[in-house]
A protein has these predicted regions:
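Ferredoxin-type iron-sulfur electron-transfer modules and their immediate structural context
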Residues: 349, 364-447
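Short acidic loop-to-helix transition motifs that present clustered carboxylates
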Residues: 76-84, 227, 265, 318
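Short alpha-helices
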Residues: 112-117, 135-148, 294-360
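ADP-ribose/adenylate-binding Rossmann-like module
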Residues: 272-302, 306-310
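Flexible, low-complexity linker and terminal segments
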Residues: 1-102, 107, 112-203, 334-335, ...
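Short, solvent-exposed amphipathic alpha-helical segments in soluble enzyme
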Residues: 58-68, 88-92, 115-117, 205-213, ...
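Conserved short S/T/G-enriched processing/targeting/catalytic segments and their helical context
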Residues: 191-197, 202-287
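Flexible, glycine/charged-enriched surface loops at secondary-structure junctions
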Residues: 27-37, 71-73, 127-133, 157-166, ...
Length: 447
């Protein structure tokens, strides 16, 4: 009986393709068991499946446009049963190297599942002499970025590798260059640092709806925070553009960064994620003359060297004056964001925000709605530009404010100072594998 089902598995790929063709005819797509994207004369092709394909596509378009790179991607639409003939037809005849990306780790195996399937499919084909490399990505929900994909295409020698992890123990990781902006021209990348329960996430969800519903722009939002959201750090990643957005990763290079909590200035690297000429908005109670002494040296240095436009706004004061209260600054900062970015004309943005506020808070009464309207009006004009002085370029790096633990058991001291502090500073993804050699069994010290 186990073997009697073979004809059904053999027939399945053709059936799936038949239904894909029906979908394609209905909505104008081109779904196939394996889709190819990239240069027609590609010499290095990635094989992958899942959301990473969007990032790879975006990177290919960037590389082909900038350098004429001969790179491509085969997207696996149907994994099981693996249709070998359809896969081979999707491969460019010019290919010399294939890198297979698996989002899994199979300890003890000679390779991950998709890699082994590709090797088997090629073994009796015209591509049997093509070099096949095996890579792992996305382990532990690590972001896969365009810079990492470029590293995959640049790799010609490392037969087994990982991306997104700095492996200084078994040395499987690829050398990754600096973050690059591969989004289509005209795409605006924005990042907001908020405090859990201050309304920042909710305001940004409203911003996405406003832009998506009232303009012709494509919109995308990711919200990054842990399960203990209230009182913790929240990060909102917003993208807007005139072309489809394929960026399935968090923003590393932003046009606009907003810090809604001034204490974050010494705790996190925020400004350093801005592109040259980007805009930084800081919510604080300091005046234009006072703010300089509260900004760490490395932040001032970066702003001076990269021509950053620096603005401050006193959301606490405005919140009190409009009756919103000192902690509900979300609407105020949202209004300032729309004015500073100009994504929507100021008057239109003002009206749309007020309509959204009425829809959101209408059930709480007219008084609450009017307070939100007042906050929107105030936030649109209350920010001030701070001069970024040339001499800031010579400021020293003061580092992040870590709470170093000095007393207690050695295992606890090591974990707090070498792992936990970096995770708290949102730098955990940069920790090397060697930082975890004492915790390979998954345990953490208790105390």
């Amino acid at each position: 009986a186990r073997e009697a089902c073979n004809p059904y598995y053999d027939a399945l790929p053709a059936i799936v393709q038949e239904y894909m063709d029906k979908v394609n005819k209905k909505i104008g797509t081109n779904y196939a068991l394996f889709n190819y994207h990239g240069a027609q004369d590609a010499e290095h092709v990635i094989v992958a499946m899942g959301s990473v394909n969007e990032t790879i596509e975006e990177t290919i378009d960037y590389m082909v446009e900038k350098t004429g790179a001969k790179v491509g991607l085969i997207k696996v639409r149907l994994y099981r049963p693996f249709a070998t003939d359809a896969f081979l037809k999707a491969i460019p005849k010019t290919v010399k190297t294939i890198s297979v990306l698996d989002r899994t780790k199979e300890p003890g195996s000679i390779g991950e599942p998709l890699y082994l399937d590709v090797v088997a499919a090629l073994s009796d084909s015209e591509f049997k002499n093509v070099t096949v490399l095996s890579g792992r990505y996305g382990l532990g929900s690590k972001d896969t970025t365009p810079a990492q994909i470029v590293a995959v295409y640049n790799n010609k020698d490392k037969k087994r590798f990982t991306i997104g992890i700095n492996d200084d123990v078994t040395h499987l990781s690829l050398e990754v260059g600096p973050a690059i902006v591969t989004t289509p021209a005209g795409t605006v990348n924005c990042k907001f640092w908020g405090l859990g329960a201050d309304g920042t996430v909710g305001a940004n969800k409203n911003s996405i709806k406003i832009i998506g519903d009232n303009t012709d722009k494509y919109a995308q939002a990711y919200f990054d925070y842990d399960s203990k959201k209230s009182g913790g750090v929240t990060m909102s990643h917003l993208r807007f553009g005139d072309k489809p957005i394929k960026s399935t990763y968090l923003i590393k290079r932003a046009n606009f960064v907003a810090c809604h909590n001034p204490s974050y200035m010494t705790k996190f690297n925020m400004v350093q994620e801005l592109v040259d000429g980007g805009t930084f908005l800081l919510n604080c109670t300091w005046s234009k003359d006072e703010v300089e002494k509260h900004i760490p040296g490395q932040v001032k240095k970066y702003m001076a060297e990269h021509n950053i436009k620096f603005y401050i706004i006193n959301g606490v004061k405005i919140g009190i004056e409009t009756g919103m209260g000192p902690t509900r600054i979300n609407t105020i900062l949202q209004s300032a964001f729309f004015t500073l970015t100009g994504i929507i004309p100021k008057e239109q943005a003002n009206k749309l925000m007020k309509d959204a506020a009425e829809k959101t808070y209408g059930r709480k009464g007219e008084d609450v709605v009017k307070k939100n309207w007042a906050a929107i009006d105030a936030g649109a004009n209350a920010f001030e530009e701070v001069e970024v002085k040339k001499e800031w370029a010579s400021c020293a790096d003061e580092g992040l404010e870590f709470k170093t633990k000095t007393e207690g058991r050695k295992d606890i001291l090591d974990f707090v100072n070498n792992v936990q502090n970096y995770i708290s500073a949102q730098e955990g993804n940069n920790l090397p594998v060697s930082a975890f050699t004492s915790y390979v069994d998954g345990s953490t010290p208790i105390g």
